[in-house]
Amino acid sequence: MEALLIIDMQVGSFQTPRFEAEKVIENINCLSIFLRKKNIPIIFIQHDGTKENFLVYGTDEWNILPSLIQETNDYRIEKEANDCFYKTEIETLLKKLGVQKLYICGCATDFCVNATVHGALVRDYTITIIKDGHTTADRPHATAVQLIDFHNWVWENLTPTQSRIEVKNTHEIIQ
């Protein structure tokens, strides 16, 4: 069984301009529509921030972007750390659903997406990164494009414990 993880695509995450945000949202929507038709679970991950930072539970900025397609039978997992597996119910849910393969997309490439990829790797999940389905912002020492390209390259070239990570564009999956 497979599942799609949509990480931190929250209103507050996009108060900072993100690289090709509209295109990323469009790609995630296309992929989620395709996977729902195949009865593949869609799991939205939401970061719970603190009053000292942002993404505080229950606030407008904590909500999933309204432009993302959500269905009532989609799953939602809250997290407090970058890695979706750290002190959350995700692993229990994935085991209950019989999931062994993850499609991973979302925000931010260099933080929560990357941390979750590594969390999934050490748990021996088969992983497909949605190459055009994750985004980030410019950082002090690298542009968003550089960070996205760098992480896509690293993920494609990692030597994980079982199977290699696939890095594919949306159209390669939905064709």
Task: Name the predicted role of every residue range.
Residues 3, 30-33, 55-175:
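Active-site-adjacent betaalpha module
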Residues 4-14:
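Metal-dependent nucleic-acid phosphoesterase active-site entry motif
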Residues 10, 48-49, 108, 134:
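Catalytic metal-binding/acid-base residues of hydrolase active sites
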Residues 13-16, 50-53, 137-139:
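A short acidic, helix-capping loop that chelates divalent metal ions and anchors anionic groups
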Residues 17-48:
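A short alpha/beta connector and helix-capping loop motif
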Residues 47-51, 61:
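Glycine-rich, small/polar surface segments that engage phosphate groups of diverse ligands
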